[in-house]
């Protein structure tokens, strides 16, 4: 079986001291690049999609594509709901076959966050679906979820344990200074906070907002317990910039099968680098 849960992937990463990259998919070409590159490098990867991505592609279509490509490349893949907020939406996609979910209720007060997440966990675990949740809030925008930088909140280590125990989640997304989108300047990550969270919580930890982070910072977070690295903006930017450059230089181009090759090449470089930074090559 090639379409798998993220739970075993992340538990393996936690034991092995590496991270599994979760790449947000926006079109067929992104999927092709991620899966082909991961298969060539024998690296575990997670195919992630926001609510907007699932609406754009269609849940059944996306599930069928992931399954077909996993079989084609004989490579295990996980498909993951990223930053989903509505119980009914999550339930519908789980019933369709999704086996990994991020319920994002981080905008709610602590007690309400726990209540919302536990409702999703109780439902998802009936279907053997792994659940990620976030404590603290990242600045920036991901799909329809937008948080002003001034309102971003860091994860409280002591609350993290209470949150994990009360909800029964399988992995915890932490806020330590990253943000969604690309960075105008290098962020100051709170490694001490991450180390404290690791001491309080024994779950696989997740880092959102990794686009544009240095190799050094990514690898330091992995040493301190991060087992899943999310990448979205870096792929979109590589695709868009390469495509713009190609069409500017070749205004006569009309065949997408030709002019999308430059965009795929640019994304391939990003995927290869992220896999190397995560230390997961050869781990699939």
From Swiss-Prot:
InterPro entries: Aldolase_TIM (IPR013785), Class_II_FBP_aldolase (IPR050246), FBA_II (IPR000771), TagBP_ald_KbaY/GatY (IPR011288), TagBP_aldolase_GatY (IPR023955). Binds 1 zinc ion per subunit. Zn(2+) binds at residues 83, 180, 208. GO terms for cellular component: catalytic complex; cytosol. It catalyses: D-tagatofuranose 1,6-bisphosphate = D-glyceraldehyde 3-phosphate + dihydroxyacetone phosphate. SUPFAM superfamilies: Aldolase. The active site is at 82 (proton donor). Its cofactor is Zn(2+). GO terms for molecular function: tagatose-bisphosphate aldolase activity; zinc ion binding. One of its GO terms (biological process) is galactitol catabolic process. Pfam families: F_bP_aldolase (PF01116). Keywords: Galactitol metabolism, Lyase, Metal-binding, Zinc. Pathway: Carbohydrate metabolism; D-tagatose 6-phosphate degradation; D-glyceraldehyde 3-phosphate and glycerone phosphate from D-tagatose 6-phosphate: step 2/2. Transmembrane segments: none annotated. Disulfide bonds: none annotated. Dihydroxyacetone phosphate binds at residues 181, 209-211, 230-233. Belongs to the class II fructose-bisphosphate aldolase family. TagBP aldolase GatY subfamily. NCBIfam families: cbbA, PRK09195.1, PRK12737.1, tag_bisphos_ald. This is D-tagatose-1,6-bisphosphate aldolase subunit GatY. It comes from Escherichia coli (strain K12).
């Amino acid at each position: 079986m090639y379409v798998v849960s993220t739970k075993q992937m992340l538990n393996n990463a936690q034991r092995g001291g590496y991270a599994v990259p979760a790449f947000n998919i926006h079109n067929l070409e992104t999927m092709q690049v991620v899966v082909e590159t991961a298969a060539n490098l024998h690296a575990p990867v997670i195919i992630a999609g926001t609510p907007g991505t699932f609406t754009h592609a269609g849940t059944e279509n996306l599930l069928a594509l992931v399954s077909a490509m996993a079989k084609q490349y004989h490579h295990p893949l996980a498909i993951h709901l990223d930053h989903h907020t509505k119980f009914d939406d999550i339930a519908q996609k789980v019933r369709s076959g999704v086996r990994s979910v991020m319920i994002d209720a981080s905008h709610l007060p602590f007690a309400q966050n726990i209540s919302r997440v536990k409702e999703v966990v109780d439902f998802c675990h009936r279907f053997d679906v792994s659940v990620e949740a976030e404590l603290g809030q990242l600045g920036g925008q991901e799909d329809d979820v937008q948080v002003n930088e001034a309102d971003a909140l860091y994860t409280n280590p002591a609350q993290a344990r209470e949150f994990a125990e009360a909800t029964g989640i399988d992995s915890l997304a932490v806020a330590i200074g990253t943000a969604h989108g690309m960075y105008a300047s290098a962020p100051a990550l709170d490694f001490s906070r991450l180390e404290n969270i690791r001491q309080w919580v024994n779950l696989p930890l997740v880092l959102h907002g990794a686009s544009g982070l240095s190799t050094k910072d990514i690898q330091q977070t992995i040493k301190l317990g991060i087992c899943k690295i999310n990448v979205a903006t870096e792929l979109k930017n590589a695709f868009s910039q390469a495509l713009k450059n190609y069409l500017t230089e070749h205004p006569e181009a009309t065949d997408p099968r030709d002019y999308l090759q430059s965009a795929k090449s640019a994304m391939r470089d990003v995927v290869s680098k992220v896999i190397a930074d995560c230390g997961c090559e050869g781990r699939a």
